[in-house]
Curated annotation (Swiss-Prot):
Organism: Citrifermentans bemidjiense (strain ATCC BAA-1014 / DSM 16622 / JCM 12645 / Bem)
InterPro entries reported for this sequence: Ni_insertion
GO MF term list: lyase activity; nickel cation binding
Domain of life of the source: Bacteria
The protein's name: Putative nickel insertion protein
Family: Belongs to the LarC family.
PANTHER family in the cross-refs: NICKEL INSERTION PROTEIN-RELATED, PYRIDINIUM-3,5-BISTHIOCARBOXYLIC ACID MONONUCLEOTIDE NICKEL INSERTION PROTEIN
Coiled-coil stretches: none
Keywords in alphabetical order: Nickel
Length: 385
């Protein structure tokens, strides 16, 4: 399984991420061709070799050729990506990043998610950075992403909302649940886009996972800090963990006094925050009270973040957790062509093909046909790998 490790020793930004992926093998021309699937223009892409403190890296720059670019709301960006010609997995990754970013902006500005109005992020260059990251991860075949802690930074930064403290409020919101590293000096080290990429896609934090490195990419930021090279280091490698074996935590609590309608929202919040699986099962508690057992399977690094969600989004006043190991069948995520269009599917090593729910749901809504019919069509036409 291909894994990527983001070593954010100097921070992370959207352009640094795309630059590192280019250095790892994403051709700039492929990036241009894939981005052509988005319904907007008025920009050019440039990538070049640079040096930061004597270390060679790659920079990535988006230059606007049309000055009059509209600001965009989150709802419009989400619809634009969904209606584009991008691959299903690229759409899914980009949507996860944008939604995480929109949630942070909504929390900071106190507005509903649908009304979030992006300024810097709504600009073409930031849309390119986020979608470009999704394109790069898909092109390189990355199936799991891990990251180091993030530097907090200090000082002030100029934004569309005026002069704000570092990290910007949206960045600070996105950093919740992510380990922070020691102070490395003045300046903005993590941008909202960079924080959103890590918050939305990282499967765990800390040192690199067991892996055999296949390549290293250095993505250079625009600024040149005096303390250390302004580079994002991304390691691409093959996982060396026992095939299909993974250390996890099981988080549990029993709930007997909550409106059942809230359970669905609780599950959504946990899955969006990185839970590997969430399940509800009925049980009888003392005095024969009917209740629900919430079980969350999680990466050990996500314990604090997921526990906080359980305690804030439910009536639970406590929970328990314990380590466990799980074994999963080796699988890859692929895009298959069907009579209904491109569909994302999981392909197991046995050859069995399983349709991806989000991809099938999108087709069902677009074509106005029952979801079960989409599943049957995909299973019939894709069959065995």
């Amino acid at each position: 399984m291909k894994v990527a490790y983001f070593d954010c020793f100097a921070g992370i930004a959207g352009d640094m991420t795309v630059a590192a992926l280019i250095e790892l093998g994403l051709p700039l021309e492929v990036l241009r061709q894939e981005l052509a699937g988005l319904p907007f223009s008025g920009y050019t892409l440039e990538s070049r070799k640079v040096e930061r403190h004597g270390v060679a890296g790659t920079s990535f720059k988006v230059t606007l050729t049309e000055a009059d670019q509209p600001h965009r709301h989150y709802s419009g960006i989400a619809k634009m990506i969904e209606a584009s010609g991008l691959k299903p997995r690229v759409k899914e990754l980009a949507q996860r990043i944008f939604r995480r970013l929109a949630e942070a902006e909504a929390a900071v500005h106190g507005v509903p998610l649908e009304r979030v109005h992006f300024h810097e992020v709504g600009a073409v260059d930031s849309i390119v950075d986020i979608v470009g990251t999704a394109i790069g991860l898909d092109y390189l075949g990355v199936e799991a992403l891990y990251a180091s802690g993030l530097p907090y930074g200090r000082g002030f930064v100029q934004t569309a909302h005026g002069r704000l403290p570092v990290p910007a409020p949206a960045t600070a919101e996105l950093m919740e649940g992510i380990p922070l590293t020691a102070d490395i000096g003045e300046g903005e080290r993590v941008t909202p886009t960079g924080a959103a990429i890590i918050a939305a896609l990282a499967d765990g934090f800390g040192p690199p996972p067991p892996m055999t490195p296949l390549g290293t990419g250095y993505g250079a930021g625009e600024k040149d800090f005096p303390e250390l090279p302004n580079l994002l280091r991304v390691l691409l490698g093959e996982s060396t963990e026992a095939k299909g074996h993974q250390e996890v935590l099981v988080i549990e609590t029993h709930i007997d006094d909550m409106n059942p309608e809230i359970f669905g929202f609780l599950m959504e919040r946990l899955l969006e925050a990185g839970a590997l699986d969430v399940a509800f099962s009925p049980l009888q508690m003392k005095k024969n009270r009917p209740a629900t057992c919430l079980t969350v399977i999680a990466d050990p690094a996500d314990l604090e973040k997921l526990s906080a969600i359980v305690l804030s989004e439910s009536t639970a006043i406590g929970l328990r957790y314990y380590p466990a190991r799980r074994v999963t069948a080796a699988r890859s995520l692929e895009t298959r062509e069907t009579t209904l269009g491109e569909v994302a599917v999981k392909v197991l090593e046995t050859g069995r093909v399983t349709p991806e729910y989000d991809s099938c749901r999108r087709i069902a809504l677009e074509k106005g046909i029952p979801l079960i019919e989409v599943y049957r069509t995909v299973e019939r036409e894709c069959g065995q790998a």
